[in-house]
Every structure is written in C-alpha cells, then in structure tokens.
Amino acid sequence: ALTRLNEEGRGEDYSNIGVNVISLTDQDLQELYQFMGDLDALSIRYASRHPDQEGLRKRLEENIALTAVVEEKDTLTGQETSCWIKASDHFHLMFYDYADNSRLTEAADRLRGQLTIFSNAYEREDRPQREIFREHKKIWEAYRQKDYSAAASLMKEHLNRSLLYAKELSQKML
C-alpha cells in the first residue's frame, strides 16, 4: 500500500522512517481533475475508432440503466450507493477498454487513485449522484448519436464540475 501511495504521488518515502502521505492543495486538485478530463476525453476519441461500436454502446446503455436508480429514489441505501459508485466509475473505464491504448489507460490509472479519495466521498451524497448521472447520460446521448466531439467536451465539463465537489470536500476536511 505504501509503495502504491508513492507511485501515485500521494506519498514521500523516507528510508528507515516510512512514508509521509501528501495532502492535496486546491491547485493539485485543479491540475488532477483537468488532466483527468483531458485523458477521459481522449479515451472517448480513441474509443470512437474501435470496430465494435455496437458493443460499447450496449455496455454504456446498460450502465446508464443501472445508475438511473438515483432518479428513482430519494436516497440510496449504503449498499446501493456502493454499487452506484462502482457503476459510475465504470462508465469512464469503458471508454478506456475500447480505446485500445495501454499507455493512455496506464496514465489514467495512475491519476485515478488520487481522485478516488475525493470522488468516493462526494459521490455518497444525493445531489452529486443525481448531477453525475445526468452528466453521464448527456455524454452517453452524444456518443450514441456519434457526436464524439461533443461527448469528449461533455466529459471534460463533467470532470470540471466534479472538481468543484472535490474542492468543497477538501475545504470541509480542513
């Protein structure tokens, strides 16, 4: 675990002393979410060239149907929330699966660990869940209509809005 913190840039290793966990500043969050938005948008562009578009569209549609539970209930149970977060995260990962670019996926994986600390916390709240679902649905609609440029732009906007939740959470943690 300590080695992973180090690899993800969330820790500093001191020989014979241990690892010091680094806290993220607002500037760090800004850079992380902006870059992640760029990577996610790029994964959409790469995925749009994959020969099995029907397979990707089907998986995205199933994901949207699964996460739509936030529109149907006032509040999710703890177990439903955990399942929803996993499915919500998977929405992003499906584009990487179809991007067929291991270096893009590896770069995103390295950053994702740093963002997960925040997203797993704010995605437990009702308002962010609903807004994230609506944003995913818009991305899906653009992708389904083969407007890949719009889908990529919407993904970047989605990460920018997620940044606001992360900053709010960061302020609460101080």
Where are the model-predicted features located?
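Glycine-rich loops and low-complexity Gly/Arg-rich segments
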Residues: 37-38, 45-48, 109-110, 121-122, ...
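Short arginine-rich
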Residues: 160-170
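Short linear motifs at protein or domain termini
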Residues: 1-49, 168-174
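Solvent-exposed loop and edge beta-strand segments that line ligand/cofactor-binding
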Residues: 124-128
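A generic membrane alpha-helix/interface feature
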Residues: 41, 119, 130, 164-165
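Generic secondary-structure boundary/loop-capping signal
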Residues: 18-21, 101, 129
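Conserved amphipathic alpha-helical segments that form helical-bundle/coiled-coil interaction surfaces
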Residues: 27, 53-120, 132-142, 150-161
